[in-house]
Structures are given as structure tokens and as C-alpha cells.
Amino acid sequence: MDPKESLTPPSREEIPSSVLGRERAHVMDFYKSLRGGTPVKVSAASPSLAAVSQPDSKQQRLAVDFPKGSGSNAQQPDLSKAVSLSMGLYMGETETKVMGSDLGFPQQGQISLSSGETDFRLLEESIANLSRSTSVPENPKSSASAAGPAAPAEKAFPKTHSDGAPEQPNVKGQTGTNGGNVKLFTTDQSTFDIWRKKLQDLELPSGSPGKETSESPWSSDLLIDENCLLSPLAGEEDPFLLEGSSTEDCKPLVLPDTKPKVKDNGELILPSPNSVPLPQVKTEKEDFIELCTPGVIKQEKLGPAYCQASFSGANIIGGKMSAISVHGVSTSGGQLYHYDMNTAASLSKQQEQKPLFNVIPPIPVGSENWNRCQGSGDDNLTSLGTLNFSGRSVFSNGYSSPGMRPDVSSPPSSSSAATGPPPKLCLVCSDEASGCHYGVLTCGSCKVFFKRAVEGQHNYLCAGRNDCIIDKIRRKNCPACRYRKCLQAGMNLEARKTKKKIKGIQQATTGVSQETSENSANKTIVPATLPQLTPTLVSLLEVIEPEVLYAGYDSSIPDSTWRIMTALNMLGGRQVIAAVKWAKAIPGFRNLHLDDQMTLLQYSWMFLMVFALGWRSYRQSSASLLCFAPDLVINEQRMALPCMYDQCRHMLYVSSELQRLQVSYEEYLCMKTLLLLSSVPKDGLKSQELFDEIRMTYIKELGKAIVKREGNSSQNWQRFYQLTKLLDSMHDVVENLLNYCFQTFLDKTMSIEFPEMLAEIITNQLPKYSSGNIKKLLFHQK
């Protein structure tokens, strides 16, 4: 049966006129004998149980519009209280929201009446029966009645429960009058019998929202306007709901048991005003969800703090699909909307924790909690879990919904525990670095090791092949490889001193800036000479220094001149290869022409090996022994062998001079580089200008090394003279050694072996020495 047909008056004679309420859609007709005028349009507020008026009650009058042509009718009595108590309604505009306390009535418990569960029918009663009933409270909207016969009023059935019993209005027995003694309802039970009979004839459709949920605050009447669907949530004129508001705190509406209870004598047992709880529906303004269709509330399994409103299918009204507007995007089908169901503590919690508008920024955590709540939904409902809340500030009022607040009790994710910058590692041993020491990010252990190694001038020797693994566990196994790795990383004592100088300059400039004026204090004081934080040439030379090689000499076998000379030649061949690699790593050397590089190496290979031998002998044995290798040391006993003493005496001269002058490691590195550049062809090099520039650069580096060792003293030039004099004397030493080397190379009867690399160099060098095409670059004239 069509719900509209069941609610239509039977005939025109029986019902002169019926008016549909525009705002809340409650139909009320007033009989002509009582009204005395044409039908009036009355708007009803939210359904609530009206109380009985008292004589001294305040009467708030509201205007009622009448049709044209009714101005000639007689003055109508005041109908501001013309609402039946049994109808469970009170009259008033939606904007004014007149409550029972405003009309001066004793305030009764209010019961929200679902419009989908109430049907309005004519009561086929006579005016005489109506006159015996209680008078209708005066209508606050009627200011003056029009002349003419009274319009009959259409009565409404009380709210019924699922068992079909009518709901008993809250009446205390008072009778109100309409300016006279005319009573609208009798005090006996005849009225309720008629209601029950009419209610049985009423057939509600099976799909009616009233049958689906009996106490849902979102259920609405089938004949009301679509604009009234939000009436249980907020007022009609609420701009936040029209522009996309949501329910922030939705309390469950619990209706009391209002079945009529009758005593044996026929009197009604009415509950006291304090015994009936006041159901309230609290609405909070939100910014991104607009509920525009009735729904069913159900509790989610994920937690007691949330419930969801499910919607499915098409709405009956107008055949339109029910939808939820999320950020202005309308969705249809099954939708989910979450409400905060903490009815006990949410009100006080809201008042304390609700942030102010435009003061506290919105909390951007809505999507996380939303996704967590979507876990128990259907597959077609999970689309809302992927909403992007990044642009929410456009719609936000300055705060977020309590349902969207972060869950502080949730355990942190495993990924958050692993977040953070990775630890910095030492560039030497890969341990955790403690800071930047000597210009390199290192640990404290490598910092102390490097300082002691440099200041103690230790000459570490590797027991292996100079390729030991240096890590946190094995860094103490080989100090030679560890020290080499420190140099390769770029550690330099100059960096520490430079840092101290910078700190001192900054402190000095800070003191000066405090004494100057305000304008000069704002200027940045830059030192005249910026300290050089880049690695110096000496530090680079330390890094590229060749490793100590082993001869592989078997000391268990008796020594002989042939055996020792062969072992020295084989060791010399590997040292030449290492010298070639070292020369190519010298800054600026590879900029020379390739022929010039080969020529310089052919002229200087003996200089390099003898000077390095003298340094090792000076550091290891205080110039008393010749330390060719860790496993091949020439002592006095071996020097006494035939053809060995004279050659060893020339070599010991170099180590003794280094011992006498106490040459530092930086000075040794610069002198060794200058020996590479100490001999050139007589006709010059192809890159002569570049060669001269490179040589002058390392001469200056030698001067810096002297200053570093001696400080700013008058002995610097004297030491520079002594060191350069030693470099000049190296030509005589090398010349004697080359002559003996060429002799043994050419004399096949001695059967002394030469490695391939060394034999090739000697073969190319012999013609040049024989022709005298060699120019010695000396610092001092003889």
C-alpha cells in the first residue's frame, strides 16, 4: 500500500483542508467549528511530548498566514494552545525552537518522535466529543483568527511500538481551555480505542524506514521534503551542515517505554517528569563529511570508540541514491561514516580538548585512523580508506574531529624504530667515528694512533705484503698498514693546528667586534690569510710513499758475495717498479711529457733506492747497518765479504748524514722528490719550463718542512744549506755505485743475475753515461 494513499484524507466533506508542514512535515487540520476560519499553515518543530499548560504561563505568539479572502470572517479565538496532548507535538517555528519551558509549561521529558513511524489520520469524531476533551494549547504562531466557520483540526496518532500498542502521552490530568469551556478530548479511554482501531487499518509499507529501525534519529517520514532529512541532527538554518558538516559526537537516542498504563478504575498512570530521561542529539560542526541520507548505526568490532552508519541501495524518496559527500565528492552505494560513541565522557572531553578556530592547526592524522577503521568493512567500502587529507586545510575550520585524533595508545611501528641517520664510520678501521680528527672522520683509537705514530717518528714495517686488513678487530695487528691507511685517508697534523689557529682567530675577532660600534659589529671579520684546509703536498707524499718490500733472502744458508749481490739485484728490480708507480703519483709529474718522465726515471732510479736505503738504515739501526729489507740487513760481517765493503761504505755515508742532521720525515720526502728531479739531459727536456716549475715547488716545500721542524728561527737557512749540500753529495755516491753496477752487468764471468726491468733500464742508461749526456742539477757550486 502506498504510504501517501494511507495518509490522504478520505473526502473533502470529512476533511475540509489539510496542510503539509513545510519544515517538519507534520499534518494538522483544525475543525471549522473550533477554528472559525479557513485552514491555516502551521510549521511544527522537532517532535516532542507537549506538556499541559498552566493559567500563568507565558504565551509566545507567532504569526500564522491565512489565504486571501478570509479577512471578513469573525474573530477567531486564541489557538496558541490548540495542539492535542495526545499528538505528542508542540508548535513553533524551527528558528525559534520553542520548548515547554518557554511557554511556561512544566517541562516534561522529551521523546523524539520518528516521522517515519507516525501516521496522521482523521478522527471520525464529532465536535461534541472533542469539546469534552482537554483544550488544545494555544498556538504561538496565531496572532489573530479570521472570521468564518471554524476549521476542523486533524488529529495525529501517537507513536506506536513494534507490537502495535499506541504510545501514551505524558499527561498529568490538567485541562487547558481555548478561551472558553470547549474541551477537545474526553478523559475516558474511548479516544484510545478509536486510535487502536484506526491504527489496525493502517498498513505501512514493508520497506518503510519506520519498520527498519524504530528509534533511529535518522529515520524520516516518507512525505517530508528532502531538506528535512537532517532534522534529527541539527537545525534547518545550520550553514555548516549545508556546506559539508559532519556529526562529531553522535549520542545514541534511547526512548523510554511510553506504553499507556491504566489502573483498574480507568485512570492513567503517568510517569513523573524527572523519571523520563531527556534524549539529546548533539551535533558538532565538521568540515569534510555531509550526511544526507538516513542510516543504521551499528557498533564496529575494531573498538568501542567508533560506530559506523551503513547505507545500501537506493533511497525510497524520489528514487534517488543515498549518498555521502566527502570533501565535495558524492559517493553512492554502501558507505561508511564513523561517529564518536563515547557518550559519557565525550561532552566534557570536547569542552576541554576542543581547539579554537584558527589557533591550533588541524591534526593531519585523519587518514591513518580512517584506514584502521575500514578494516572490517566490505571490499566496496574500502575506497574511503584511501582518501587524501592533504588538502583538508581548505575545508577545515581549524580543528579536526575527535574521531580523527591520533591513537596514542597504539604501539609504534617497526619502521619508525629504525628511522634516524646512520652512524658515521671511521675511514681507517670502519669503527664508529667520534669526530673529525686531523682533517679526517675517524674514531678515537685511530686518532691517538696517528698522533703517536707521527710525533714518535716510528718507521713501522709490515710482516706481510703491506695489504693487511684494518678493521675494528684487527687494527692493532699491523701498525704499518694502519699508519699507511691513515695517510691514505688524508690525516694530517696540520689540520689540527689549523683548527686551533681558526679558533684563536675567531676568539680574537669576537673580542674586537665587541669593542667596535654596532655597525662594525655586524660586519664579518675575515682573516687576512685563510688557513689551508686542503691536504698539503707533504701529506700527499706521505700517502704515496712506497711500501717496504721483502727480499726473500734465506739467512739459514751461508752468505756469499754472489748470493747477496743477486738478492740485492732482484730486490732492486721490484723497488724500481715501485719507484715508477710512486713517481707517477707525485703531484705534477704526470703533467710532463712522457719521454721526459722516462728520462727522469732512468737518470734517478739509483738516487731513489740509495736515499731510501739510507733512511731505513737511519731509522732502524742508527746508521750502523744497511737495512735493505726487513729480512736482508747487511751487518759488518757481511760487509767484510769480497767486493762488498767499498760499496757498503758509500751507502753508509748517506745514512750517517741523515743521522747527523736528524732529518725529519717531511724533509726526507721533499728531498727524495728533489732527487727524482736532480738529473736531466744536457739538451734539456721537452717540458723544461714545467719541469723547472715543479722542481721549484718542491724546493719551497722543503723550506716549509724546515720551518715546521725548527720554527721561526735564524737556523732555517743554515739547515736548508746543509740539506741541499747533502743532495749535491748524492751525485758522487750514486756515480760510484752506478759504475760498479755497470761493471757487474757487463762482466758475464761474475754470473750475477739482473731482473728484466733493471736490465732494460741499465741498457738504455749506459750510452747516455758513456757519451756524457747528463746534466747534474746542483744547489751549490763546487
UniProtKB/Swiss-Prot annotation:
There is a cross-link at K263, K282, K298 (Glycyl lysine isopeptide (Lys-Gly) (interchain with G-Cter in SUMO2)). The modification Omega-N-methylarginine is found at R24. Residues 529-763 form the NR LBD domain. Residues 537-702 are annotated as: Interaction with CRY1. GO terms for cellular component: centrosome; chromatin; cytoplasm; mitochondrion; nuclear speck; nucleus; spindle. Signal peptide: none annotated. Belongs to the nuclear hormone receptor family. NR3 subfamily. Heteromultimeric cytoplasmic complex with HSP90AA1, HSPA1A/HSPA1B, and FKBP5 or another immunophilin such as PPID, STIP1, or the immunophilin homolog PPP5C. Upon ligand binding FKBP5 dissociates from the complex and FKBP4 takes its place, thereby linking the complex to dynein and mediating transport to the nucleus, where the complex dissociates. Probably forms a complex composed of chaperones HSP90 and HSP70, co-chaperones CDC37, PPP5C, TSC1 and client protein TSC2, CDK4, AKT, RAF1 and NR3C1; this complex does not contain co-chaperones STIP1/HOP and PTGES3/p23. Directly interacts with UNC45A. Composed of three domains: a modulating N-terminal domain, a DNA-binding domain and a C-terminal ligand-binding domain. The ligand-binding domain is required for correct chromosome segregation during mitosis although ligand binding is not required. This is Glucocorticoid receptor. The lineage of its organism: Eukaryota, Metazoa, Chordata, Craniata, Vertebrata. The gene is NR3C1.
